[in-house]
């Protein structure tokens, strides 16, 4: 996240804005490239070999060479995805239609020679969804692309449209030609429609960031719009087998977002918000990375289609709740590293504890404050986050991890931003409530920061924590220095005591392969549908007593090779297992094949519960009420 965007200063601006260019035997009037918009044309009608054609038409360059980029990474992904790998047949064309010399410098960069003669560039784009099971480092589906001729086009535009070096701040005009029957859903501003080209949609953006910040989905529309106070929300659903519609999900979504808006109060940075829901049929050429990617005024959510409505709604609501709260941070409150994001040489911010942690904390806190879940549900979520956070390095500085999140060993700890990141905010919230007599919490803090910073006013990355301390209490500085900047694990029991809670251990019954709807095993589509024991979760007594570990690949059970069919049968049979049944399970652990055996027993799970403390004092109960009820 560097300062290329917004800080590029042209050293060659001349006193005139118009040149007369001689070409093709005619006179062509051209504006300097830094004075006009880039026109990007995407053709969704003439799909060839699952690829679409893209043409970018800038104005005239005066430099001898110019570099063209497709993003290496984009905000919110915290990963190097190299979207340029999906670009093929790249050509730079002069005004006579001839090809200019192009040097490909890396996966995402093309240097165009004799750029003064450049008329346009022309290339083909392959999608990412149908490669997810083929590559070792697939693009996360919500930030990926889909080309399904005549049915669906998921246009995360960083996968289709690039930028010329130094021209990130000039306007873009997108001209997208689409088949009859497919309609676009996006928060991107529509331009003036050309009546002579009814098949072409025109969109406009003030700068390149606005292009990639506004995904578009073309599909046979299933769309609903509803009003949440002063925010117009659009929900669009693509369900390939027609199992779900926007209408079927609208009521629950509207209820949830009304709760979010009530929680946020006067924090608001948008008048419209678009939720794009893509449901995957789980074929080999479809999306398998489930989750969401946030944008300023929209979010892309990818989920499996073959689940119950209840489970889908639960997954969507938790996911969208998180993504919607990103309008607070980083979409409103953010650093220079995000405001001036460098898509190909990113400089990362040190504040993932806030960008993802605060957001995830709010996504859970608002539900208890708005009466959508019970206190017991909220406590259970916190305990689950503590349990999952233990699978990461608990002595890693969150500030150091965040600043270096694209590199190892920090990269493999990224998912902890949703676990310990949320818990950091919980501790900060309780500290603020305690020090302010219950009046101030993290929501108050974010409201204060949003008054000072906003969409076009970033903060300085290395000064934010000092600013927070100055706004609050010296004890908050001690907390940050110890548990966020420093590497000391959080003493959760101390925080439970502050609010009159305590932990207690209970043994609960589970299934052999499932705890309710939560599986202990999973399938790896990238490894011939291998069945493996899930990592990062607490295993039940069945797996623990056998000696199984997270990550073990189950090769066979009782002499029968495991595959998708056999494992389903085995799960069904396990319902009637006798506790004295002997079982032999062969697993692959790394390069070693290990035989595990023993009685199946009665499967149980040791669960740590968070419960009210007997004899809690009045101050503890008051602080708990302030924390949970706001």
Protein language model features and the residues they cover:
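C-terminal motif of bacterial Sec signal peptides marking the signal peptidase cleavage site
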Residues: 20-23
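Bacterial signal peptide processing site
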Residues: 25-27
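Juxtacatalytic substrate-recognition/specificity segment
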Residues: 56, 222-351
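Early extracytoplasmic/domain-onset interaction patches
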Residues: 29-73, 154-158
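Bacterial N-terminal signal peptides that target proteins for export
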Residues: 2-13
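C-terminal recognition in membrane/secretory proteostasis and scaffolding
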Residues: 363-364, 372-630
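Non-catalytic architectural context of zinc metalloproteases
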Residues: 80-89, 93-94, 99-258, 262-270, ...
């Amino acid at each position: 996240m560097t300062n290329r965007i917004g800080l590029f200063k042209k050293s060659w601006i001349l006193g005139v804005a118009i040149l007369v260019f001689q070409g093709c035997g005619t006179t062509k009037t051209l504006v300097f490239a830094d004075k006009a918009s880039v026109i990007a044309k995407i053709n969704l009608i003439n799909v060839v070999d699952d690829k679409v054609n893209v043409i970018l038409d800038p104005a005239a360059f005066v430099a001898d060479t110019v570099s063209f980029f497709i993003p290496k990474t984009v905000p919110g992904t915290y990963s190097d995805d190299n979207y340029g790998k999906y670009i093929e047949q790249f050509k730079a064309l002069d005004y006579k239609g001839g090809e200019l010399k192009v040097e490909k410098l890396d996966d995402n960069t093309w240097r165009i020679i004799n750029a003064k003669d450049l008329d346009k560039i022309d290339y083909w784009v392959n999608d990412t969804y149908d490669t997810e099971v083929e590559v070792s480092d697939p693009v996360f589906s919500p930030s990926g692309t889909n080309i399904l001729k005549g049915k669906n086009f998921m246009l995360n535009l960083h996968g289709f449209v690039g930028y010329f070096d130094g021209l990130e701040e000039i306007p873009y005009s997108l001209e997208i030609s689409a088949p009859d029957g497919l309609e676009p859903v996006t928060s991107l501003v529509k331009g003036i429609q050309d009546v002579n080209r009814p098949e072409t949609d025109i969109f406009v953006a003030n700068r390149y960031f606005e292009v990639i910040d506004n995904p578009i989905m073309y599909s046979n529309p299933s769309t609903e719009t509803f009003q949440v106070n002063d925010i117009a929300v659009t929900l669009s659903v693509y369900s390939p087998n027609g199992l779900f519609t926007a209408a079927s999900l609208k009521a629950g979504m509207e209820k949830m977002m009304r709760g979010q808006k009530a929680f946020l109060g006067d924090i608001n940075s948008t008048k419209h918000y678009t939720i794009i829901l893509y449901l995957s049929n789980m074929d080999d050429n479809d999306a398998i990375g489930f989750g969401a990617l946030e944008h300023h005024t929209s979010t892309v959510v990818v989920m499996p289609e073959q689940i119950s409505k209840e489970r889908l709604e639960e997954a969507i609501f938790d996911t969208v709740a998180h993504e919607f709260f990103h309008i607070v941070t980083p979409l409103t409150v953010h650093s220079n590293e995000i405001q001036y994001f460098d898509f190909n040489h990113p400089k990362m911010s040190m504040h993932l504890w806030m960008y993802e942690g605060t957001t995830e904390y709010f996504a859970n806190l608002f539900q208890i404050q708005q009466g959508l879940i019970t206190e017991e549900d909220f406590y259970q979520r916190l305990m689950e986050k503590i349990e999952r956070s233990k699978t990461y390095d608990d002595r890693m500085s969150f500030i150091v991890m965040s600043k270096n999140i694209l590199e190892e060993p920090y990269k493999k700890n990224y998912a902890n931003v949703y676990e310990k990141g949320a818990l950091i905010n919980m501790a900060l919230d309780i500290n603020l409530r305690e020090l302010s007599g219950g009046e101030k919490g993290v929501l108050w803090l974010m409201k204060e920061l949003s008054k000072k910073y906003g969409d076009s006013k970033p903060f300085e990355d290395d000064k934010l924590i000092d600013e927070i301390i100055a706004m609050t209490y010296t004890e908050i500085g001690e907390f940050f220095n110890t548990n966020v900047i420093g590497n000391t694990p959080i003493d959760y029991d101390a925080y439970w005591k502050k609010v009159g809670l305590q932990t207690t251990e209970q043994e609960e019954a589970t299934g052999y392969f499932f705890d309710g709807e939560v599986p202990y095993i999973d399938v790896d589509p990238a490894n011939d549908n291998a069945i493996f024991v899930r990592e990062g979760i607490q295993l039940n007594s069945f797996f623990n007593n056998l000696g199984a570990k997270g990550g073990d690949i189950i090769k066979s059970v009782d002499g029968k090779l495991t595959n998708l069919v056999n494992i389903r049968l085995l799960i069904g049979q396990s319902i009637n297992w006798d506790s004295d049944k002997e079982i032999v399970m062969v697993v692959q652990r790394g390069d070693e094949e290990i035989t595990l055996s023993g009685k199946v027993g009665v499967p149980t799970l040791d669960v740590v519960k968070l419960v009210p403390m007997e004899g809690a004092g009045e101050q503890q109960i008051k602080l708990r009420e302030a924390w949970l009820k706001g």
